[in-house]
Amino acid sequence: MKEKGFWEGVQAAVPTALGYISIGLACGIIGSPYVTPVEMGLMSLFVYAGSAQFAMIALIAVQAPVAAIAMTVFLINLRLFLLSLHASTYFRHTSLWHNISMSSLLTDETYGVLMGERVHTDKVNPMWMHGNNLNSYISWFLGTVVGTTLGGLLPNPEVFGLDFALVGMFIGIFTSQFQIMQKRIPLRKLFIILGVVAVSFFVLLTVVSQSLAVLFATLLGCTMGVILDGQ
């Protein structure tokens, strides 16, 4: 079978790109009173993190110090270290620069698309991953810039429900992956792992921040998966 390349990666990321445009518009509209389209564009190019950018806008709105903004972004994006670490195992024989560029543009959604592709093939072409990442990256950039530009024209953007787009996209990706995983992993094992992640997340919320709770709950879920595989 012919190995999938850059444009197949772009095609695989189309659902993610559509979701990014929608939530990017929402982010831009919400941020329009506090940042210009140019500033939002630079934020999207160099930060490129939906939840972190929403947090940045909220902190900018209350004139929080730069150190507080930087620390918040770091904690929110901490989980991406874990995702990049795992994704890099699929590109062991790829050059360092390929891995750096792929990890720099990796998000929850592009990682999810990669995991879906891994179900169908044992080897993923690095160019496929670049296509997956770049389509999502450009879509997010365009969505946020256009949203900021149009922000002043929409006095009540909440009525469009754009803030739910990211949640809907996550649900769609998870549902698709869960259906695929059922064919390879016993349902009992899947529910045990999901239960560990869910329970540990809510327990951890009582002692650490939400970002750290996500990270630690994910690690506990991975640990449980390893334990179950060893049985």
In which residue ranges do the predicted regions lie?
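Helix-loop-helix hairpins and the membrane-proximal interhelical loops
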Residues: 1-49, 56-73
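Helix-loop-helix junctions within the multi-pass membrane cores of secondary transporters/permeases
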Residues: 71-163
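Membrane-embedded alpha-helical modules
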Residues: 126-216, 223, 227
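Intrinsically disordered, low-complexity non-transmembrane regions of multi-pass membrane transporters
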Residues: 1-9, 123, 184-185, 230-231
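A cytosolic-side transmembrane-helix exit/cap motif
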Residues: 60-64, 89-97, 116-123, 180-188, ...
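Juxtamembrane membrane-interface segments at transmembrane alpha-helix termini
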Residues: 52-59, 81-88, 174-180, 206-207, ...
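Alpha-helical transmembrane segments and their helix-entry boundary regions
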Residues: 40-43, 54, 69-70, 97-101, ...
